[in-house]
UniProtKB/Swiss-Prot annotation:
Protein name, as recorded: Heat stress transcription factor A-5
Region (Hydrophobic repeat HR-A/B): 140-190
Biological classification of the source: Eukaryota, Viridiplantae, Streptophyta, Embryophyta, Tracheophyta
Biological processes, Gene Ontology terms: cellular response to heat; regulation of transcription by RNA polymerase II
Lineage top rank: taxon: Eukaryota
Biased composition (Polar residues): 357-370
Length: 475
């Protein structure tokens, strides 16, 4: 009871400016003789006290005086009031104002402020430390913002990537479905023999043959716009484009076959003489004249882009689509395409198996036949030059006389026949019985000899160019 009263008194005194309650309680506990076995004044000095048995001190005395049993907390309290440990070997503490028998000196002992005080407000930090902390906070805020932006971009990229992956998966699935359908269709179609046969035929067909059938081209040198085709040449208005069309028609894969039909044997005499006599020779044919067949030939020419061959009747030009791929003929194949077309109305034996040379004998070699034909053309060229000179002289002397024009027109077709003495050309160029009426009818159409000769001369120039092109193709 006395300890409790002393504690209350010390608390009251401390509250009025006296010693602290902790100091008063500690003094009474040390000064009590009943506790000398646990805690007492030091034997060497009255200015210190010793805790002899600290386990019992914490278990029995601390709860009675300080309401706790923590010995470490009691030591910290002593340190706050300036007590120090004197002997490291035992728990002995001393203070200059804590002396035995001098209780009044306790008021001089004051509690020291702790190093880390919790009573300071946040604004009490120094300015330099506060600036450092603010900079650190700002830096961390920027890093946080950057991380959030990177995270948002990553989420956007991930979303776009997922969309692309889904689209790719859909496309792959569609491709697989199409492939499955194609395989099923091919399996079903392969069971159809007609479909397989068509595929085999398409594979065997060459693109060259397909182009040859699909392209629509006219024969080089043919003029389908002139009404009087019986008395004019096939070179009249298309001679300027014959070279280009011939080059387009000739193909490398058909050069061997077309060479026989486009032999460089066409000369100006063939163009002039044969074109002027084309209408006369219709009556010389042993089969007679067939105007129905001639009309059919003229109507069919613009529609057939393939090669033309002589009909077996010998009176008209008949189109043959299969001639493009048929084997080359032996005799008339040596003649040019233009010559064959021009002489289509003549009475020729198309089925001859051999050619005729200059002496009327057969020629087995096509090269020798072509050479002989070129020699005959040179002879006719010379006759054409003579005919041109004579016509020019007659036109200069009697330019204003209609009778002179008629005489020149009548002499023009007869000049080559007097010069040519070759048996090969006699069958085409020699006058035959029964042609006088046809000649009179055709002479009425050739009133302007000068115009015809100029057109024939232009046709000759273009035919020579065609012949040179064909010779280059042969090489």
């Amino acid at each position: 009871m006395e300890v409790a009263a002393g504690a209350r008194g010390g608390g009251a005194g401390g509250g009025g400016g006296g010693p602290a309650p902790f100091l008063l309680k500690t003094y009474e506990m040390v000064d009590d003789p009943s506790t000398d076995a646990v805690v007492s004044w030091s034997d060497a000095s009255d200015a210190s006290f010793v805790v002899w048995n600290h386990p019992e001190f914490a278990a029995r005395l601390l709860p009675a005086y300080f309401k706790h049993s923590n010995f470490s907390s009691f030591i910290r309290q002593l340190n706050t009031y300036g007590f120090r440990k004197i002997d490291p070997e035992r728990w002995e503490f001393a203070n200059e104002y804590f002396i035995k028998g001098q209780k009044h000196l306790l008021k001089n002992i004051h509690r020291r402020k702790p190093i880390h005080s919790h009573s300071h407000p946040p604004g009490a930090l120094p300015d330099n430390e506060r600036a450092i902390f603010e900079d650190e906070i700002e830096r961390l805020s920027r890093e946080k913002s950057n991380l959030q932006a990177d995270l948002w971009k990553s989420k956007q990229q991930q979303s776009g990537t997922m969309n692309q992956i889904e689209d790719l998966e859909r496309r792959v699935l569609g491709m697989e479905q199409r492939q499955t359908k194609m395989i099923a269709f091919l399996q079903q179609a392969s069971k159809n023999p007609q479909f397989v046969n068509k595929l085999v035929k398409m594979a065997e067909a060459s693109s060259i043959f397909t182009d040859a059938f699909n392209k629509k081209r006219r024969l080089p040198g043919l003029d389908y716009s002139i009404e009087n085709t019986e008395t004019t040449s096939f070179y009249d208005d298309h001679s300027s484009t014959s070279k280009q069309e011939t080059g387009n028609l000739l193909n490398q894969h058909f050069s061997d076959k077309l060479r026989l039909g486009l032999c460089p044997a066409m000369t100006e005499s063939n163009i002039i003489t044969l074109s002027t006599q084309s209408s006369n020779e219709d009556n010389r044919s042993p089969h007679g004249k067939h105007p129905e067949c001639d009309m059919m030939g003229r109507e069919c020419l613009p529609l057939v882009p393939q090669m033309m061959e002589l009909s077996d009747t010998g009176t008209s030009i008949c189109p043959s689509k299969s001639s493009c791929f048929a084997p080359p003929i032996s005799d008339e194949g040596l003649l040019t395409c233009h010559l064959s077309l021009t002489l289509a109305s003549c009475s020729m034996d198309v089925d001859k198996s051999q050619g005729l040379n200059a002496n009327g004998t057969t020629i087995d070699n096509p090269t020798e036949a072509a050479t002989a034909t070129m020699e005959k053309d040179d002879t006719i060229d010379r006759s054409f030059d003579d005919n041109q000179k004579k016509s020019a002289d007659s036109r200069t002397a009697d330019a204003t006389t209609p009778r002179a024009d008629a005489r020149v027109a009548s002499e023009a077709p007869a000049a080559p026949a007097a010069v040519v003495n070759d048996k090969f050309w006699e069958q085409f160029l020699t006058e035959r019985p029964g042609c006088s009426e046809t000649e009179e009818a055709s002479s009425g159409l050739r009133t302007d000899t000068s115009r015809e000769q100029m057109e024939n001369r232009q046709a000759y120039d273009h035919s020579r160019n065609d012949r040179e092109d064909v010779e280059q193709l042969k090489l």
